[in-house]
Curated annotation (Swiss-Prot):
Gene that this sequence comes from: MT-CYB
Binding site for heme b b562: H83, H182
The protein's name: Cytochrome b
Subunit structure: The cytochrome bc1 complex contains 11 subunits: 3 respiratory subunits (MT-CYB, CYC1 and UQCRFS1), 2 core proteins (UQCRC1 and UQCRC2) and 6 low-molecular weight proteins (UQCRH/QCR6, UQCRB/QCR7, UQCRQ/QCR8, UQCR10/QCR9, UQCR11/QCR10 and a cleavage product of UQCRFS1). This cytochrome bc1 complex then forms a dimer.
PANTHER family associated with the record: CYTOCHROME B
A Pfam family it matches: Cytochrom_B_C
Cofactor: heme b
Length: 379
C-alpha cells in the first residue's frame, strides 16, 4: 500500500517540498536561513494578528493603543516586543540569506533570485509601514521624510506624494492606509514565498561547491529538518534574549514621544536595517539623484546574474573574489554606521566614499576580478 503522504493530494505536495525533497548532501548552515525566514514570517503574522486586535489606526489613539497593549493586555508587552524585534531577526536572516546567494552564486537561478529580490522589496515596504504605526515622533517624521522622497519624481512627484498621504501632510488618512497595507502585505509575501519555492524546486538547491549535485542527493527529512531545528533554536534564543532583557535596544527613544508635527527630532533616521540605504540616499546632494541611488542600492541585485563573468559558479575556490565580497560586507556595515550619524564632517565624506565603493565593487571590481581569476586558471 502506498504511504498516505505520497498519495493524498495535499500531503504529497508537503511531502515533495519538505520530506522526500532531494537535497544536496553537502549544503552548510548558510542554507538554514530560508527556513528561518519562513518561521520569522509566520511569527510576524501571528504576533501582528493579535496586536491588530488591540491597535487602533487613528492619529488620536494610535500611540495610546500601543501603550494600552503593553500595560493592560495580557502578555501584550511580549507580543509587541516579539513583533518589533522579530522584524530585526527577519532582516538579519534576510541579509545573511542574500549574502549566501551572492557568495555561492545562487543568483544563477535567475527566476528564484528575481522573485527573492521582489520579496526583499515587499518585506522592506511592510517594515517601513509598520514603523509608522506606533505614531511616535520617529514614526511620524520617518513617514514624512521617506514618502516625501517621491516628490523628486519629475512632473508627477508632488501629486503622487499627496495621493499617498491622502491629504497635504502625513495625517489620519496616511496612518489608516498604512495599517491596511501593513496588514495585507505579509499575506502577499506568503504567496510570493510559495512562488519562490516553486522556482527553487524546479532546479533544486545550489551547494557550496557550485557544482551540480544530482548524483549525490539525500532526503530533506530527517537530515535537514534536524539541522533547521538547530538553527531555529539558536534564532529563538537570540530573539528571546533581546525581547526579555533589552527589548528597546534596537528601537529609537524618540518613538516614546507621541507624534508632534510642530517639533522635528534633531536626527531623523529609520530602523537600523535601513540605515545602509539611508546613508546612500544622504550621500548624494541632489534629491532625485539620492532617490535613484537609494532604489538602485537594492535593485542592483537584479543585474548581478548578468555581471557574473567567472567560469566557476561559487566563490569557494576564488580567493580574490572572496576578498572583494568581504570588502563589500565591511562597506555595507560602514554605511549602516554612517546612516545613524548626524550629517556633518567627517561622516559626510565617509558616506560618499562608502557609497561609491559599494557600487564600484558590484558593477566594476567583481566582474573584472572574475576575469582575472579565469585568466590565472587558464580557462
Amino acid at each position: 500500500m502506498t504511504n498516505i503522504r505520497k498519495s493524498h493530494p495535499l500531503l504529497k505536495i508537503v511531502n515533495s517540498s519538505f520530506i522526500d525533497l532531494p537535497a544536496p548532501s553537502n549544503i552548510s548552515s548558510w542554507w538554514n536561513f530560508g527556513s528561518l525566514l519562513g518561521i520569522c514570517l509566520a511569527l510576524q503574522i501571528l504576533t501582528g494578528l493579535f496586536l491588530a486586535m488591540h491597535y487602533t489606526s487613528d492619529t488620536a489613539t494610535a500611540f495610546n493603543s500601543v501603550t494600552h497593549i503593553c500595560r493592560d493586555v495580557n502578555y501584550g508587552w511580549i507580543l509587541r516586543y516579539l513583533h518589533a524585534n522579530g522584524a530585526s531577526m527577519f532582516f538579519i536572516c534576510l541579509y545573511l540569506h542574500v549574502g549566501r546567494g551572492l557568495y555561492y552564486g545562487s543568483y544563477m537561478y535567475t527566476e528564484t533570485w528575481n522573485v527573492g529580490v521582489l520579496l526583499l522589496f515587499a518585506v522592506m515596504a511592510t517594515a517601513f509601514m509598520g514603523y509608522v504605526l506606533p505614531w511616535g515622533q520617529m514614526s511620524f517624521w520617518g513617514a514624512t521624510v521617506i514618502t516625501n522622497l517621491l516628490s523628486a519624481i519629475p512632473y508627477i512627484g508632488t501629486s503622487l506624494v499627496e495621493w499617498i498621504w491622502g491629504g497635504f501632510s502625513v495625517d489620519k488618512a496616511t496612518l489608516t492606509r498604512f495599517f491596511a497595507f501593513h496588514f495585507l502585505l505579509p499575506f502577499i509575501i506568503s504567496a510570493m514565498v510559495m512562488v519562490h519555492l516553486l522556482f527553487l524546486h524546479e532546479t533544486g538547491s545550489n551547494n557550496p561547491t557550485g557544482i551540480p549535485s544530482n548524483m549525490d542527493m539525500i532526503p530533506f527529512h530527517p537530515y535537514y529538518t534536524i539541522k533547521d531545528i538547530l538553527g531555529l533554536l539558536l534564532m529563538i534564543t537570540v530573539l528571546l534574549m533581546l525581547v526579555l532583557f533589552s527589548p528597546d535596544m534596537l528601537g529609537d527613544p524618540d518613538n516614546y514621544t507621541p507624534a508632534n508635527p510642530l517639533n522635528t527630532p534633531p536626527h531623523i533616521k529609520p530602523e537600523w536595517y535601513f540605515l545602509f540605504a539611508y546613508a546612500i540616499l544622504r550621500s548624494i546632494p541632489n534629491k532625485l539623484g539620492g532617490v535613484v541611488a537609494l532604489v538602485l542600492s537594492i535593485l542592483i541585485l537584479v543585474i548581478i546574474p548578468f555581471l557574473h563573468t567567472s567560469k566557476q559558479r561559487s566563490m569557494t575556490f576564488r580567493p580574490l573574489s572572496q576578498c572583494l565580497f568581504w570588502l563589500l560586507v565591511a562597506d555595507l556595515l560602514t554605511l549602516t554606521w554612517i546612516g545613524g550619524q548626524p550629517v556633518e564632517h567627517p561622516y559626510i565624506i565617509i558616506g560618499q566614499l562608502a557609497s561609491i565603493l559599494n557600487f564600484s565593487i558590484i558593477i566594476i571590481l567583481m566582474p573584472l576580478t572574475s576575469l582575472v581569476e579565469n585568466h590565472l586558471l587558464k580557462w
